[in-house]
Each structure stands twice: as C-alpha cells, then as structure tokens.
Amino acid sequence: MQIGFARSIDPIISQEVTITRVAITTEKDAENKNTEMGRKTIVPYGLYRAEGYISANLARKVTGFSEDDLELLWEAILNMFEVDHSAARGNMAVRELIVFKHSKELGDCPAYKLFDAVEVKKNEDVEYPRKYQDYTVTVHEEQIPDSVEVRRMN
C-alpha cells in the first residue's frame, strides 16, 4: 500500500491567531498569576485529494494481504480522524473514498487514467469554499474500462 501526499483542490490561505492561556496550571503560576501568549496557524477550510495504490501482485506473492485486510483498510481510512481528534488539526474528515478494482492482478488500465477520470470541481456559485458541499465530485465512468470496478465509499 502506498499513499501519496495529499494536495489541496484550491489554494489555501493559512491564518495566524493569537491565543492566551489564563488557566493556572502550576503553583508558580498561582503565585505570579502569569498568563502565556502564543500563536497558532489555522486553515479555515481546505479540501485535499490523495491518491494511493495497492499492488495485488505483491500482496499475493510477498505480504499475504487479503480481501479481508483490504476491507479493514478501507474502514480505517474512512474513520482515521474519528478516533484521533486534535485541537491542532481542527475538524478533519475523510469525505469520500473512490476505489478502483481491476479484474487482472497486474491491472486493466494505468492508474493515471483512472485518477484523471475523477474530477473535483468547485461549484460555480462559490467564490470561497468553506464546506464539502461547495464542491462537486464526479467520476467520469465512460473513461474507465468496463473491466475496472468503481466503488465510492463515504
């Protein structure tokens, strides 16, 4: 299994916010009544796309990776942020997983053609996207061979 780095669909603009800690956490803080200032960089909204690959040939020959393992992997990817919330990341979620399954172990079609068949486009009436619904995700199935199964999961 290989997953490439995710890239944002549209340019993102990071913002820096100032935070102040007023909670007293040590006895020394209580004596001095100190507060602490800090900064945090945030991205108000970003939709990212990542692409990944699984080699059925290597799975069979080397790792023993099975169909059951594959289903568990899909479940883990779809829920990976649900069990690891963090103030540092804000509200992150996997919105959709589009999976291509070939009929042949070495593939029916080059991966780039399958990835090119997935279009993520900002809706025309949206200038600054702030939610997933500001985008339309289209899989152009006419560009995908009949021997490749397309599965959309969310």
Residue ranges and their predicted role:
Residues M1-N154:
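Basic polyanion-binding and macromolecular-assembly surfaces
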